[in-house]
Structure formats: C-alpha cells, structure tokens
Regions:
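Conserved beta-ketoacyl condensing-enzyme motif
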Residues: 6, 52-116, 238-262, 266-268
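Short acidic, glycine/serine/threonine-rich loops at helix termini
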Residues: 18, 92-93, 125, 152-156, ...
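Acidic-glycine-rich active-site phosphate/pyrophosphate-binding loop
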Residues: 31-39, 90-105, 143-149, 204, ...
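Flexible, glycine-rich active-site loops centered on histidine and acidic residues
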Residues: 133-167
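Acidic, glycine-rich active-site loops and adjacent beta-strand->loop/helix elements
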Residues: 12, 84-89, 116-119, 145-151, ...
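Claisen-condensing/thiolase-fold acyl-transfer catalytic domains that form or cleave C-C bonds
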Residues: 57, 61, 87-88, 101, ...
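Condensing-enzyme catalytic core mediating Claisen C-C bond formation in acyl metabolism
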Residues: 1-52, 157-225, 233, 328
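Buried hydrophobic positions in well-ordered alpha/beta secondary-structure cores of metabolic enzymes
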Residues: 6-8, 37, 67, 78-81, ...
Length: 328
C-alpha cells in the first residue's frame, strides 16, 4: 500500500527585519503600551517585505525554486501544484499558474489555488496527501504557502500590525512504498467568529465600488480560548484512532500565532519542551505557512529527524481547527 511522504521542504523570507521597538514606539504615539501583548504573542522580530518588486507571489516562486533544487527535481517532475494563500497577488489567473510557468511544469500537471486562511497550508498538505493516495496517476506534488501579511496589516491594531511577518514555505510530497509519511488528520469548525476578522473589512463588493476601505484587515476582539477545548478533544481522538499517545509524538509544529496558545497546549498534554518547535520569536506570525516553517526549522536544527512522528495544529479565522499527523 502506498504512502505519501514529505520529500523536501524549503522557505523564503525577505531580508528586511523589524524588531519590537518599532511597534512599541508606533503604538506609544497612539497612547498604547503593547509590551505585554508582544510577550504574550512571543514576538521579538519579524521579516517584512520592503521592496516594491516583492510580494506573496515572488516569495512563493523563490521558495518553490529552492525546494525543487533541494529535492533534485524540476518542474517537469511534478504532477500536482497547489498554492495556498489568503493574500493572493491575483485572482485571475490563479497564482499557481505563475508557479507552473516559472518552473516550466508539464501540460498535464494539475494546478490550483486554495484558501483556508491561516489553516491553509496544513489543509492543502492533508488534502493533497489524501488525493494522491486515491489517484494512481499522481506521484509528486508541490504545496507552496505564502502570505504577504504586512500588506494588509492594520496599523491601528497591534494584533496584525505588530504580530505578522512575511514568508513562504514549499514542500514536495512524494508517493512511496516506505512505511512513513501521512497518517491522519482531524477538523473542528465553529462559525461563531465569522464576523470578527474580515478582509476586505465590509466585503469585496463595497471595496471595489469605493464604499469601504480595502487597505487593512479589520479585527474585532473575541475570546480565542474557546478554541482550546475542541482542540484537546480532536487531538485526543486523532491520536486514539491511530493507536498513538502524546508520548509517541516526537515533535509539535503548531500555529505560531501566539506563544500563549502553544504553552497552553503544551501544559495540557505535559509535552517536553524539546518537542515544541517555536519560531514565532524569529519569524513572527506568517499565516498559512506557519506550522511548516516550524517544521523546516525543526529539520534544519536536527530536532526533527526521518521517522519522527510530527503533530501539526493550526487554526483559521472563523474558526476552523486542523490537527494532522505525519511521520517525517
């Protein structure tokens, strides 16, 4: 029986670094102290696009070229390309079309864009893995996630402006006879917060017709802790139905949105610190690519090795939670 493994992973981020002091000073001028906020979120610095020629698509193209080189492959070797983003550079054509052209993929390569907000790349990898298992003609897939978050971050709201960074991550999935790779995934969706995080703030129609601001995300306050009980339930179910316990997990690549969330999950399951891959102090929050940048850094540092069981967890606005098990 075939399995789907992560053959290679690579990333791209801009060179420009902004540290916390910039944002502390920015909000002090507005009469607000955000130092505690930055501690809770676990921020120190972030990579931010500062060149007009860079955007979410260019980051994705660079990450794609890097992962193909790492895998020893070309665009001709790909059967499937999926671009995950919540900040597409274009809607016509899809961004994956530009990836296809840049790497000169074949005419029979399947391409698509997808958007599950911050849960996007995890959803894309999970669903591509299942599709590859079902389709005998698909042997390799490129999943690239890229968000130009600073483009639409709201300078009046620290939850985006001081919290986000820009980056892209690309993975190559490969069908294999090895006893490794994709294991399972679980979802929980509750639409209770569907009107709390909006871009465009009042919908595309009003933005295009000039009746609403299109410049920034509008983020209204809500209690994100409500997502934790279903998180514990779905992780418990995911582990149980695959005959695993939390002690069988070798590494945790969670959403880097807030360090406080990671610490709560870690405390709930009593996960050893060395198993928690945290990169939010370096990259800040990169949106769709967030758990996979953690995977990349875990592999790079030697904390994640071939054969390790990796638990992914992330959340998309609205909200949708995704947990996924992969044997790297």
């Amino acid at each position: 029986m075939p399995n789907i493994k992560i053959k290679a992973i690579d990333i791209y981020h801009p060179n420009h670094v902004i540290e916390n002091d910039f944002y502390i000073n920015h909000f002090q001028k507005k009469g607000r102290d955000i130092q505690h906020f930055l501690e809770v979120m676990g921020r120190e610095k972030r990579y931010v696009i500062d060149k007009v020629e860079e955007n979410g698509l260019t980051m994705a193209l660079e990450a794609t070229k890097r992962v193909l080189e790492r895998a020893g492959m070309t665009g001709k070797d790909l059967d499937y390309i999926e671009f995950s983003t919540q900040v597409p550079e274009t809607t016509f054509p899809i961004n994956a079309m530009y990836v296809h052209a840049e790497i000169q993929a074949d005419h029979d390569t399947i391409i698509k864009d997808s958007n599950a907000n911050c849960a996007g790349m995890t959803v894309a990898v999970e669903q591509a893995s299942r599709y590859m298992l079902a389709n005998p003609h698909i042997h390799t897939a490129l999943i690239v996630g890229s968000d130009y978050n600073s483009l639409i971050a709201n300078p009046e709201q620290e939850i985006t402006y001081a919290n986000y960074g820009d980056a892209a991550c690309a993975v190559i999935l490969e069908k294999t006879d090895e006893n490794t790779g994709f294991i399972d995934a679980s979802y929980h969706t509750d639409s209770v917060f569907k009107d709390k995080i909006n871009y465009p703030a009042h919908g595309l129609t009003k933005a295009v017709k000039g009746k609403s601001d299109v410049q920034a995300i509008n983020w209204l306050p809500f209690d994100g802790n409500v997502a934790l009980p279903p998180t514990y339930k779905m992780i418990d179910q995911l582990l149980a139905r695959n005959g695993l316990s939390i002690k069988d997990i070798d590494a945790c690549c969670f959403s880097q949105f807030a360090l406080s969330n990671i610490l709560k999950i870690q405390d709930h399951y009593q996960i050893d610190q060395e198993k928690i891959i945290y990169v939010g102090d370096t990259y800040a929050y990169t949106g769709t690519s967030s758990p996979f940048i953690a995977l990349y850094e875990g592999i790079k540092s030697g904390r994640i090795k071939r054969g390790d069981n990796v638990l992914f967890w992330t959340i998309g606005s609205g909200f949708q939670i995704v947990a996924m098990l992969y044997q790297y």
